[in-house]
Amino acid sequence: VLFGDGAGAVVYEAIDDPADSSGPGVLGTDLGADGVSGSTMVVPTLGSRGELTSTRDPANSRLHFEGQAVFKIAVRGMIDSVCRALDRAGLTADDVDLVVPHQANERIIRAAASRLGLSDDQVMLNIATHGNTSAASIPMALNDALDTGRVRPGDIVVFTAFGGGVTWGSVVLRWGDRVERLGTSDAALDPVEVTVDELLAKNREFFAPLYD
C-alpha cells in the first residue's frame, strides 16, 4: 500500500427538524478503541511514554506494523462498528446505498464489504488512484463519489474508519438534497524547490538537540 498526500473538508449545516428521522441527518454512530491491540500498529517513542534520549534505539522511532494482525483487527473492527451504527439507526446492511470507508487497504475494504454482504456498487474505492491519504481519505472519497454520481438525495450513506491505538468509528446518515460540491478552487501550491531528503535533514537538525 502506498501513501498519498491530500486534504479534504466537509461542511455541515443544521436541519429544520432534528427529530424527523425520515429526513436528512445523522441516524447512528459508533466510536471505540481497544488499547490491548495497540502494539500491532505503533511508533514506540511517540507520545508521553516516548524515550527522548540520544541513546534510544532508532528502530523505536519507526512505525511497527504487524500486517496480518492489523488486517484481521481492521476487518473485524469495521464490520462490528458499521453493524452497531446501523443497529442504532434501526437499519441493516440491506438499507445501505453507499459505504465510504477509510482508504487504507483495498483488501481490508473488500474483505469487510464482502462479510457485510455489500456489492461493489455499494462501496466507494479510490485508493488505487490516490493511495492512503490517512485522515483525508474519507472526505476525498466522498468528493469522488459525488463527482461520479454515486450519491443521490435521500441515500443511506455510511462512513467507517479504523486506525492506530487501535481505534474505529462509523457514521450512518441519510443524505440531503445537495449532491454536488460547494464549489471549486483554482488555488495552486508554490513550486517545490527542495527534495524530501532536504526537508527531512532540516527536521533532523531542528529536533536533534531535543534528544540530547
What positions do the PLM features span?
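Claisen-condensing/thiolase-fold acyl-transfer catalytic domains that form or cleave C-C bonds
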Residues: 75, 79, 86, 97-212
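Short helix-to-loop capping/linker segments positioned immediately adjacent to catalytic or ligand/cofactor-binding
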Residues: 70, 85-89
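Short, surface-exposed connector motifs at secondary-structure boundaries
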Residues: 90-95
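Alpha-helix termini
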Residues: 17-20, 89, 149
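Condensing-enzyme catalytic core mediating Claisen C-C bond formation in acyl metabolism
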Residues: 1-72, 76, 80, 174-212
